[in-house]
């Protein structure tokens, strides 16, 4: 991996392919996600939480078997929305210290070792006269979401946990009469506890924007049915 800071002089003609695929880490049965995505995510994916050493993290369920992404077909996603952690492609944020400023600033980088970088059939990053293309603006927005999400997600999820809204469960998913999957060690928003919130706790979560996250995450669990339907459409999977 060779991350290089992007600029419109050295990379004026650089093109990058937005294609996806197993070679680029898209063959995964879950994707790390962040609060700013929840509204888009809940239309497509089930949102679950897991306790990690670094704290609570949220994930979108993508598949049931190991390395299975039921929303991936060849080199593109079939969902209307793609989690930002996968939208970013070969781009990343790197901290760069200016010559006259002791404070490091987040700057856009691209991995020159990624085969999508320099693809003649890819999308340009800069306009003819130096401005950013819509593709580069999109990538910048995705990375901003990820950067800000990593800063704010822990506090948001801790607020859900402190309010008693996250319940530990083992998801049981029946694809057919003969095939059952379990997803252990996850937490989901408890709908009954959410509905029972009243008074000051309810007001506090509402004003902090946490209540909305809880409602979106709870609603997203209905998408397990979509996951089952996609699994059943695979060859050799009986309904």
Predicted regions and their residues:
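Short, extreme N-terminal leader segments that mark the start of a protein/domain
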Residues: 1-63
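Short linear motifs in intrinsically disordered
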Residues: 35-40, 82-84, 99, 162-165
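A contiguous, surface-oriented mixed alpha/beta subdomain in the mid-to-C-terminal portion of proteins
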Residues: 100-239
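Aromatic- and glycine-enriched beta-alpha-beta binding-site module
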Residues: 57-126
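Short acidic-glycine loop/turn motifs at beta-strand connectors
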Residues: 51-54, 95-99, 175-178
């Amino acid at each position: 991996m060779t991350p290089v800071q992007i600029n419109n002089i050295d990379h004026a003609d650089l093109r990058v392919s937005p294609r996806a695929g197993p070679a680029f880490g898209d063959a995964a049965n879950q994707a790390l996600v962040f609060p700013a995505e929840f509204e888009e995510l809940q239309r497509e994916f089930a949102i679950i939480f897991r306790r990690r050493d670094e704290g609570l993290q949220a994930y979108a369920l993508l598949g049931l078997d190991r390395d299975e992404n039921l929303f991936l077909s060849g080199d593109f996603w079939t969902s209307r929305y793609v989690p930002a952690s996968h939208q970013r492609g070969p781009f990343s944020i790197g901290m760069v210290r200016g010559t006259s400023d002791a404070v490091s600033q987040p700057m856009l980088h691209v991995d020159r070792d990624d085969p999508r970088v320099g693809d003649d059939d890819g999308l340009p990053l800069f306009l003819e006269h130096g401005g950013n293309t819509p593709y580069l603006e999109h990538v910048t927005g995705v990375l901003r979401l990820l950067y800000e999400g990593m800063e704010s997600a822990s506090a948001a999820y801790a607020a859900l946990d402190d309010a008693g809204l996250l319940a530990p469960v083992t998801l049981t998913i029946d694809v057919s009469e003969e095939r059952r999957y379990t997803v252990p060690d996850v937490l989901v928003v408890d709908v009954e506890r959410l509905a029972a919130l009243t008074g000051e706790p309810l007001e506090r979560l509402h004003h902090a924007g946490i209540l909305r996250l809880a409602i979106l995450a709870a609603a997203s669990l209905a998408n397990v049915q979509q996951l089952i339907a996609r699994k059943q459409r695979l060859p050799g999977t009986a309904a």
